[in-house]
């Protein structure tokens, strides 16, 4: 037993940060991903929770975190740019992995161990086939995959985006707490080491049809001490005013990452902060404040081009994909 424990300890990489992602359709991914969303740093990985023949993914194996992360025929999720942003802002030796289980249209009860079976009995017909992909038990699949992930890295947090189907449910925070507590117990995690990061639904400022649920989501930190809430203020959405659009998911993912980094004691720099703490680098882009270099030899690129669909930074002939956020196109690189 001692030998087995030693071998497991050696195999586990303390610099491989694992995040569990669960929820309903906005975590599942409702927006069509674009070319910029399919290119990803090798340091960002996804553990397939279901087989995906189209992408050649096998359940329980690690792959580059190229969209779609959840299942075949799903779209862009907050986790996509959550992982990208962490990779951009953490040292090069740190890798990020996500374990992703989400079911469109589900109530939080689907992830409650003592409610799942009863919930599935009354699940709508359109949800049945999706549930079968998780053997009719998404919570158990999440735990199963999380245990596989723990052999490779360390679980650093749990990302939740759910609530639309529980709109107005004042008991929702306690129900979420039961899911969180069960995950901690089943995976032998400590609450003070593994925060829950929960996102708001489409905001009232964009006509969110479930925006009233954000008042309930705001109550989560009252029942879960190690909890952070991700604002949806200002995020663009789909015409149904229920789901975010691709641009909204990208920014939402960065906001999730900003909360995770904050909990690590790292603040995600704003463009103004970058300018204050960096120096301009030589460039042929006359009159531009970017690129800039900081004391850790990180290069910041930023460009405002709202009508462009894809943008790359060209550094010595090597091209790096830039990502869109609320301030424009951006890219952060470690330089030697």
Stretches with model-predicted labels:
Residues 270-295:
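N-terminal pre-domain segments of enzymes
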Residues 334-335:
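Conserved small/polar residues in nucleotide/adenosyl-binding loops
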